[in-house]
């Protein structure tokens, strides 16, 4: 096996070994003409790429998760239907947002940038003699002019009297391609009056979002 050693003046150095297996033909790797910048990585350029020839270029490294945010309702809401429109706060217990974070106004949320987002909503409620409780995600892609139901989820609540508890959650991936016009909020619906629990120190009812990649 052939090797090239780039020797340091003190004796040791860096060794470049030949391939572990014999290629079907010679392979040409063309190095970049610049040194790149801090944080960049070497990648194969799309131009002039083939099974035996590749040009290398410096490119930005994958950013990973650049946005993470969490919100919750701070006080109880008792109703049979309506919108989770009031008493929202950004979670401040063992949490700090990553990136810019969501913006919220009267329960309507907006994303800070385009991307593929994981959205999770969870809720806890209790009622007296109710059969079901549900949460509906409403989404607008035209800056709030029109909303459509994107996800709707219900839980069965056993009719057994006072303080019959239930939980409803929503998980969805949202491909946000025009964040300036993308908005969402949550409705609730039940067979009778449900008390949806909220607390400034506990995530009884709330949401979190993660930007997991580019659109």
Question: What are the residue ranges of the model-derived segments?
Answer:
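Extracellular jelly-roll beta-sandwich "head" domains, especially the C-terminal globular C1q domain
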Residues: 62-215
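Extracellular repetitive beta-rich solenoid segments
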Residues: 1-65, 105, 112-114, 129, ...
């Amino acid at each position: 096996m052939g090797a090239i050693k780039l020797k340091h003046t003190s004796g040791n150095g860096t060794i470049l070994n030949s391939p572990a297996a014999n290629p079907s033909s010679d392979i040409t790797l063309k190095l970049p003409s610049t040194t790149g910048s801090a944080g960049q990585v070497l990648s194969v350029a799309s131009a002039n790429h083939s099974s035996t020839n590749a040009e290398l270029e410096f490119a930005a490294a994958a950013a990973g998760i650049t946005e993470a945010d969490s919100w919750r309702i701070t006080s109880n809401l008792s109703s049979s239907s309506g919108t989770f429109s009031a008493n929202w706060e950004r979670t401040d217990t063992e949490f700090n947002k990553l990136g810019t974070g969501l913006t919220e106004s009267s329960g309507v949320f907006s994303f800070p940038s385009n991307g593929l987002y994981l959205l999770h909503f969870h809720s806890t409620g209790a009622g007296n003699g109710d059969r079901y409780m549900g949460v509906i995600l409403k989404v607008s892609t035209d800056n709030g002019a029109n909303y459509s139901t994107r996800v709707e989820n219900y839980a069965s609540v056993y009719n057994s009297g006072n303080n019959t508890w239930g939980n409803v959650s929503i998980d969805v991936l949202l491909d946000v391609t025009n964040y300036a016009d993308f908005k969402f909020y949550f409705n609730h619906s039940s067979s009778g009056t449900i008390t949806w629990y909220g607390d400034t120190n506990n995530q009884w009812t709330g949401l979190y979002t993660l930007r997991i990649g580019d659109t």
